[in-house]
A protein has these predicted regions:
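Long alpha-helical, hydrophobic tracts
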Residues: 1-61
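Long, charge-patterned amphipathic interaction tracts in eukaryotic proteins
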Residues: 5, 39-239
């Protein structure tokens, strides 16, 4: 099967997984098949040669997230970093007054997956978060905000968990897990070249919110929302 056919099959499965008209079983089956096919494609497409040859394929993209560090934007970019790491990419970010700019380094194929799964996540989580908020009680607005942030971070963690489980199952006894680990390390080294990257402080976590988000993220039918893998990135509001 050619690369283009594999990618189209992955996209078709992910469209089914995100189709609200499909049954839960159909969406879950499509999602699992898409994840396994994606992981297998990533493994089989690993380039040959030494590390320096593979470094040539390293590149970067930027994602702008609207909102200050005190808004939901900080939780979204934290989730993006979690998702990027699960796909062997390294994410750092710079905070501005009204937005955050994340820079993600990795191979072109891995960055394409990060982009599409990220786009799917930011479309999917708001309605699920709204459902959770309807049944939750809070003593203060700050507690409510902490729950919302924690939920978003947990949602991305749930998606990353599924990717990592599928990757482990596919790379068992093949040695390719070491190659993927090396790919992340090279992405991190590439990001740090000539830059003094300061790691952000952890946000205060609401454990119930994080656990709820992680369950929903793991169980979500994340679809392939975007067909365009190149070109400028569109700022995504984080309210």
């Amino acid at each position: 099967m050619t690369d283009s056919k594999i990618i189209e099959q992955i996209r078709q499965l992910l469209r089914i997984a995100s189709d609200r008209g499909a049954s839960i079983n159909e969406r879950e089956l499509a999602q699992r098949r898409a994840e396994r096919l994606m992981v297998r494609y990533r493994i089989e497409s690993l380039p040959e040669g030494d590390a320096r040859a593979r470094d040539e394929d390293m590149t970067s993209i930027q994602v702008e997230i609207t909102g200050s560090s005190s808004s939901m934007a900080r939780a979204v970019v934290d989730g993006l970093a979690t998702l990027a790491r699960a796909l062997s990419c390294f994410c750092s970010w710079r905070t501005y007054r009204r937005h955050i700019v994340a820079t993600i380094v990795g191979t072109r194929s891995d960055l394409a997956y990060v982009t599409e799964f990220y786009n799917s996540a930011v479309v999917s989580y708001p309605s699920m978060l709204k459902d959770r908020l309807r049944t939750a009680d809070f003593y203060s607005q700050s507690e409510r905000r902490r729950f919302r942030r924690s939920y978003v971070m947990g949602f991305f963690q749930g998606i990353a968990d599924r990717i990592e489980i599928a990757t482990r199952e596919e790379t068992t006894s093949t040695g390719q897990d070491l190659v993927l680990a090396s790919r992340y390390q090279r992405a991190e080294a590439k990001a740090c070249e000539g830059h003094n990257i300061r790691y952000a402080r952890d946000l205060m976590i609401d454990r119930d919110g994080e656990a709820s988000g992680e369950r929903d993220g793991y169980a979500s039918g994340i679809g392939w929302m975007g067909e365009r893998l190149d070109g400028p990135r569109v700022g995504i509001a984080a309210s």
